[in-house]
Amino acid sequence: VVAAYPYGSKTIQSSYERIPGYIEKVKANGVEITSSIADLLEKVDCVLLETNDGRLHLEQAVEVFKSGKICYIDKPVGATLGDAIAIYEMAEKYNAPVFSSSALRFTPQNQKLRNGEFGKILGADCYSPHKVEPTHPDFGFYGIHGVETLYTIMGTGCESVNRMSSDRG
């Protein structure tokens, strides 16, 4: 990481409270802080779009896609299904590589399960942490972790999924 543009949500507390500390940490590691995505794009080969507010991702991603640079979008891809679909349509329009995933897909244990090291997997109980964020629907923030684990282990042939939640956190 050579440069960063530290713009995040102005309405999600877990975003705006952390950004000043993140800026200091990355600056201490020699990362240049830029004043815009346009300035950032002049300095990097690819973009890690880490804004935790999916409502901003479409606008931010389109700017990256127009540059043709590779873009990784952290969860949630978009705040709504419509935003997520629009993001992938815009990536296709600009022929820009885009990727989003939970890091849990790549954990050694999940890869061993996926690769059959413990035999054929017939079913899975997968859990995700969940923090309610009123600006995003349902499991928008953390649901990806359980879904990625499920599909990493089971593949794309999953026939049914049940979900549950608890008010105990």
Language-model segments: which ranges?
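A contiguous active-site-proximal alpha/beta segment in oxidoreductase catalytic domains
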Residues: 72, 77-136, 146
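Rossmann-like dinucleotide-binding domain that binds NAD(P)(H)
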Residues: 124-169
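Short aromatic-enriched loop/helix-cap "lid" or pocket-rim segments at secondary-structure transitions
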Residues: 13-17, 112, 136-139
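Short, contiguous clusters of charged residues that form electrostatic/catalytic patches at enzyme active sites
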Residues: 35, 42, 55, 59, ...
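A broad structural signal for short, well-ordered beta-strand segments within beta-sheet-rich domains
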Residues: 1-2, 118-121, 158
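Short loop/edge segments at beta-strand edges and connector loops
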Residues: 35, 73, 100-102, 162-165
